[in-house]
């Protein structure tokens, strides 16, 4: 399976993918963690930024031109089963990733918090669900949550792992998360 990191330019925090976290750009740190984990065949950075560069992942240009649902559909079409990661969540817990890979049985799988929040950009999207993804989008679906709720499997995780899903949206998040 391929790890696919979805990257787009941030309107709220321009240049955030390059913000240094532990000496690496935000996205580059995530790519290094995933590529070094030994859990994936390949780490792909699926970016709308044609100038993005990485030492830890292969850059593939996302020219879907739409919302994240369109990007996920394009990635599943190109790569088959994918483990989708957000480019702005630096606290990936490899034990959660590993547990999800072990539980994956060919059906889209998404972690769910104790307060019922789905983490759709820390989710496995299955090739066998591609037709359902396309139908969902074709029928006006826009939310990845809606797709997973209707077509996926949810996997609960513990409160101690909530940090895994903290993301950086604003410069103030760097302070809040002690980065």
Language-model-detected regions and their locations in the chain:
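Conserved donor-nucleotide/metal-binding helix-loop-beta segment in metal-dependent transferases, i.e.
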Residues: 93-117
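A short acidic, helix-capping loop that chelates divalent metal ions and anchors anionic groups
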Residues: 12-17, 118-119, 132, 164
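Aromatic-glycine-rich donor-binding/catalytic loop that engages nucleotide-sugar donors
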Residues: 127-138, 177-179
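Short phosphate-binding loop-to-helix
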Residues: 53-85, 91-99
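Conserved nucleotide-sugar donor-binding
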Residues: 119-132, 171
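Active-site acidic Asp-centered loop
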Residues: 47-48, 85-87
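N-terminal glycine-rich phosphate-binding loop and ensuing alpha1 helix
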Residues: 1-49, 98
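Conserved alpha/beta core of the MobA/IspD/sugar-nucleotide pyrophosphorylase nucleotidyltransferase superfamily
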Residues: 140-179
């Amino acid at each position: 399976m391929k790890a696919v990191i979805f990257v787009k330019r941030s309107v709220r925090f321009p240049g955030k993918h390059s913000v240094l976290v532990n000496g690496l750009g935000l996205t580059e740190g995530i790519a290094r963690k995933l590529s070094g984990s030994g859990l994936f065949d390949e780490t792909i950075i699926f970016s709308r930024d044609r100038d993005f560069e990485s030492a830890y992942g292969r850059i593939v240009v996302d020219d879907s031109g739409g919302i994240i649902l369109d990007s996920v559909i394009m990635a599943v079409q190109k790569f088959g089963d994918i483990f989708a990661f957000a480019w702005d969540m630096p606290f990936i817990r490899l034990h959660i990733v590993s547990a999800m890979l072990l539980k994956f049985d060919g059906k889209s799988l998404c972690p769910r918090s104790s307060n019922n929040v789905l983490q759709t950009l820390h989710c496995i999207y299955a090739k066998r669900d591609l037709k359902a993804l396309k139908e969902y989008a074709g029928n006006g679906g826009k939310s990845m949550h809606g797709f997973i709720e209707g077509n996926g499997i949810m996997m609960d995780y513990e409160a101690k792992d909530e940090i895994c899903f903290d993301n950086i949206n604003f410069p103030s998040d760097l302070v809040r998360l002690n980065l």
